[in-house]
Amino acid sequence: VTPVLISDTGLAAEVAALINRVYSDAEKGIWLEGQSRTSEAEVAELIATGQIAVARSGDRVVGSVRVHEIEDGVGEFGMLVAAPEERGTGIGTDLVSFAENWGRERGFAQMQLELLVPQTWEHPVKEFLRGWYTRIGYRLVRKDDLETAYPFLVPHLACPCDFLVFRKILDPSK
């Protein structure tokens, strides 16, 4: 499974459905019922601007990640998903490696990711991800209040949340 950037906006519905399916489980209890992580229109726009990479198994999209530049010399990845039936097969690792290589190819010194976490309880998926990102070299650089950074999201939350910002120095020789 080799992740690749895609340009076919016809895949937007399939990619959006996968993202929403994974996030509805991975962020259970964080969002009010009925909230979606993304939409077909948003994913189509991200595909059209070269920001979505997918991993395929045969004809099926089994994983995806969004990549983009957030500031000079810093890339970011997000919306990282692997189909639940494919977990443990290395798709997530392959997608993160793709994102980091995408950043290196553009001469970025760092990659960033943001992790939404509840303020008052530990979410098992979020704690797993926090540990995994740390094991693969990402370091927590700051904790931001969601209300300040993304106030438009707050009405959709089921509980107060922070987001954790992680960064990794990219070794250009890899």
What residue ranges belong to the model's regions?
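Conserved beta-strand in the GNAT
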Residues: 54, 60-68, 74-81
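Conserved acetyl-CoA-binding loop-helix of GNAT-fold acetyltransferases
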Residues: 82, 88-105, 127, 135
